[in-house]
């Protein structure tokens, strides 16, 4: 690998030419500016942090919007397209961006808002699916779990360990409550984690029955819903279908914004360039009339760069 000789370059010019000098340096791309100059009472450094942060934020938003478009409306490219790097933006395109930056960023935020709504909707679907999974073990129950019995009977819903069978439950109740005859336990479902059951007894015996079951590890399940578990599952499934339909509509709106891809790419480049420019502005020192900037340049590029600058500006 060849080692190319570098040379330090310091430029002092009139402040009225600052914008044009910096834009020319940025366009040529031959000078790497560095913040090695010390400020004085006359020459001071400008704080450009807040401006740069805003430019970088907008750049990030535009890049996110491009990623969303690539997700919902990918551009077909060749296998080696990624090796070509980013396409250079033309000066005329930048002029268009400057004129339309507000409108383009409005569309960027609109697209990202659509994506957030899709993300929120999918999270809501996951919650409803989890709720359905939680209700499945109780699907065989044909009364709302809010129902705690009648005027004379009590209904208890809850879970026991997975090792319990119908016989074990009946035997446990008989052994712990020999004096209670009117008590029936029904297993609604069983899996490797738990047994779900419903227990019916006389209301006067409810406290004793629950205490006996708790001694076996019973965990009571309470609910305030007026619907049966099956009805609650059906309601959530309907809500999921409605949300999925909403997501489809939102995704269609995002795909319809694919025509703005080039505008998003240009506005991304615009804010990247602005951020880089304001970084250089923060690195240079300036007085009321002049500014000084320092950096490194390839020795072979130094002469042509200096000649080009001198031909356009009054350098000191």
Where do the language-model regions lie?
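Long, charged N-terminal accessory/stalk domains
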Residues: 1-316
């Amino acid at each position: 690998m060849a080692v190319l000789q570098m040379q330090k370059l310091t430029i002092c010019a009139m402040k009225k030419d600052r914008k044009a000098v910096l834009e020319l340096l940025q366009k040529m791309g031959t000078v790497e500016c560095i913040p090695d100059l010390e400020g004085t009472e006359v020459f001071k450094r400008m704080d450009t942090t807040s401006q740069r942060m805003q430019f970088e934020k907008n750049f990030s938003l535009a890049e996110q919007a491009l990623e969303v478009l690539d997700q919902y409306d990918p551009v077909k490219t060749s296998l080696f397209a990624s090796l070509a790097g980013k396409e250079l933006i033309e000066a005329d395109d930048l002029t268009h961006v400057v004129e339309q930056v507000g409108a383009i960023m409005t569309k960027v935020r609109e697209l990202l808002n659509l994506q957030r709504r899709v993300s929120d909707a999918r999270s809501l679907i996951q919650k409803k699916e989890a709720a359905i999974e939680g209700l499945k073990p109780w699907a065989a129950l044909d009364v709302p779990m809010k129902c705690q019995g009648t005027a004379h009977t009590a209904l208890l819903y809850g879970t026991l360990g997975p090792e319990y069978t119908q016989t074990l439950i009946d035997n446990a109740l008989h052994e712990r409550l020999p004096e209670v005859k009117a008590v029936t336990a029904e297993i609604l479902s069983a899996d490797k984690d738990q047994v779900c059951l419903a227990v019916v007894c006389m209301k006067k015996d409810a406290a004793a029955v629950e205490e006996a079951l708790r001694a076996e590890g019973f965990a009571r399940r309470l609910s305030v819903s007026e619907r049966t578990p099956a009805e609650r599952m059906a309601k959530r499934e309907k809500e999921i279908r409605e949300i999925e339909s909403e997501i489809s509509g939102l995704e269609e709106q995002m795909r319809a914004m694919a025509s703005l891809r080039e505008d998003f790419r240009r506005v991304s480049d615009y804010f990247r360039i602005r951020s880089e420019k304001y970084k250089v502005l923060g690195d240079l020192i300036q007085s009321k009339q002049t500014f000084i900037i320092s950096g490194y340049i390839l020795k072979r590029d130094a002469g042509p760069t200096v000649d080009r600058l001198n031909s356009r500006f009054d350098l000191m």
